[in-house]
């Protein structure tokens, strides 16, 4: 199972920003525990719970967590954090230095992980690309020449290749886990104030509306609620019908509503066709079903990547405008005016939302929800939290820009280091297709003419299956190595499978 523990620099950066905004130790710790997810947030939630429920002071609660946590770096950080607070009262300087130190360590660790990924990629290319190709050629030639059983060749194609690829993908998932997403929904009723909470006391913040008391709905109210729910469903359906392309780009998996029935229909037609071999039916169904999803996911990933690349510069523009004394709404308008990339549309929509009377932070929450990547959500949450203790708008967005740029540099370094191996896998697969042409068009025909007892048809079928299965396996591995996840793997698999299927049909026709 993948380790979803975020980097230690994440809580350190959050605490540093909160202390810089003049928040107390209790407020800073509680803020991170409430607004983050993962191992560190869970540990700090225990300290907050002990303070609120057991009456312990925050120093004792964090000291207990430091003594019980099973993460040595986090344990050391908490001990140093407590010592700094007790001795100097303000841990801002320590947190700044610790953050710089952790970012250097994380960059070094990422370089080591990229080196390990390169080793895994070389193993996969050597064993499951070149090795499989060599094994297929050897077992094919020996089996046809000796007239033996095709079982060894079938074991390689139908057993070793898919199982080995699955093991490789699992190892990559453990070595390079996906980042932990923050809380998905940000539409809280939050209006930051400059009120400060007494340290160590769990008082209610004035910016949070109290929870509504539970009550029994009347029959009329229940009828109205049901009508509203039906209206929401109708509105979503109407929005989809008005602009299906836009909705599909937001949620590519919805395309399966159309592609899955189309794939089933195509499969039935091909299955009952007397001229199409059955081994071409399943690959064709796979392509019809998954190609639209792969293309839409590719467009979505490209736009998201461009947005993540632009986000640090947008945060810096907002921070720079705030330094000149502009309110947050004007800072957002300045960012929308200066930006010319993919975020311009979202920034303009946010500014328009505010101009129509929307609350600034609620509009920012909706902006982050639309972007839907961790750095945007974390920055908006952080800005809302620091707004309770400081009127300095520049601080959270400058911190968000630094955090986003650091995360982006780590991911970019990993992707650039793996592109070479993705290219090698593509080249190796097309070499496999070329070998298929040679073996099917020259060698097998020559052996069939010289030895009529050889069952060349079965070997030719296994060779065709090897090309098709190899295309799917190489595509999934290429997607994982490029850092795009399962959707990227499906895209590469569709490209390679389409090439392999076209080559196999050409061999069958010729």
Where are these regions (language model features)?
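Juxtamembrane boundary at the C-terminal end of a transmembrane helix
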Residues: 502-510
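Juxtamembrane/interface alpha-helical elements of multi-pass membrane proteins
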Residues: 1-66, 76, 185-215, 267-369, ...
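Loop-to-transmembrane boundary segments
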Residues: 117-124, 207-265, 416-424
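Membrane-helix interface "capping/anchor" motifs
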Residues: 300-303, 480-490
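Bilayer-spanning, highly hydrophobic alpha-helical transmembrane segments
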Residues: 108-172, 257-266, 284-290, 406-480, ...
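Membrane-cytosol interface segments
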Residues: 158-245, 297, 323
């Amino acid at each position: 199972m993948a380790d979803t523990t975020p980097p230690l620099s994440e809580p350190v950066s959050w605490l540093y920003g909160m202390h810089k905004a003049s928040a107390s130790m209790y407020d800073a710790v509680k803020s991170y525990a409430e607004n983050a997810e993962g191992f560190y947030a869970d540990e700090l939630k225990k300290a907050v719970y002990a303070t609120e429920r057991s009456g312990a002071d925050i120093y004792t609660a964090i000291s207990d967590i430091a003594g019980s946590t099973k993460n040595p770096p986090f344990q050391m950080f908490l001990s140093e954090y407590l010592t700094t607070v007790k001795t100097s009262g303000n841990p801002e300087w320590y947190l700044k230095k610790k953050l710089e130190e952790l970012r250097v360590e994380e960059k070094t660790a990422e370089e080591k992980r990229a080196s390990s990924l390169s080793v895994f990629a070389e193993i996969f290319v050597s064993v499951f690309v070149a090795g499989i190709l060599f094994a297929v050629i050897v077992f094919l030639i020996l089996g046809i020449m000796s007239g033996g059983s095709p079982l060894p060749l079938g074991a390689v194609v139908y057993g070793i290749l898919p199982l080995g690829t699955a093991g490789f993908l699992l190892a990559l998932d453990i070595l390079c886990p996906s980042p932990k997403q923050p809380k998905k929904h940000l539409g809280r009723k939050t209006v930051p104030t400059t009120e400060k909470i007494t340290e160590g006391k769990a008082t209610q913040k004035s910016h949070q509306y109290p929870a509504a008391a539970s009550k029994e709905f009347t029959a009329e109210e229940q009828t109205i609620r049901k009508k509203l729910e039906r209206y929401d469903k109708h509105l979503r359906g109407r929005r989809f019908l008005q602009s299906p392309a836009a909705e599909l780009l937001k949620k590519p998996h919805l395309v399966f509503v159309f592609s899955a029935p189309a794939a089933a229909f195509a499969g039935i037609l091909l299955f009952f066709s007397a001229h199409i071999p059955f081994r071409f039916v399943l690959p064709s169904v796979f392509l019809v079903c998954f190609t639209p999803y792969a293309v839409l996911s590719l467009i979505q990933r490209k736009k998201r990547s461009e947005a993540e690349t632009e986000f640090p510069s947008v945060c810096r523009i907002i921070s720079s405008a705030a330094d000149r004394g502009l309110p947050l709404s004007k800072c957002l308008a300045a960012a929308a005016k200066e930006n010319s990339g993919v975020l311009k549309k979202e920034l303009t929509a946010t500014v328009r939302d505010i101009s129509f009377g929307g609350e600034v932070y609620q509009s920012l929450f909706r902006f982050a929800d639309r972007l839907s990547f961790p750095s945007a959500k974390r920055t908006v949450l952080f800005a809302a939290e620091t707004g309770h203790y400081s009127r300095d708008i520049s601080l959270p967005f400058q911190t968000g820009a630094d955090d986003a740029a650091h995360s982006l540099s780590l991911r970019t370094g990993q992707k650039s280091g793996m592109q070479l191996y993705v290219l090698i896998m593509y080249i190796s697969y097309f070499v496999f297709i070329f070998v298929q042409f040679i073996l099917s068009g020259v060698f097998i025909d020559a052996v069939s003419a010289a030895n009529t007892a050889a069952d060349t048809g079965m070997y030719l079928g296994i060779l065709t299956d090897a090309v098709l299965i190899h295309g799917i396996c190489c595509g999934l591995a290429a997607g994982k190595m490029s850092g795009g996840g399962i959707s990227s793997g499906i895209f590469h698999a569709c490209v390679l499978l389409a090439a392999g299927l076209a080559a196999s049909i050409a061999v069958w026709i010729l």
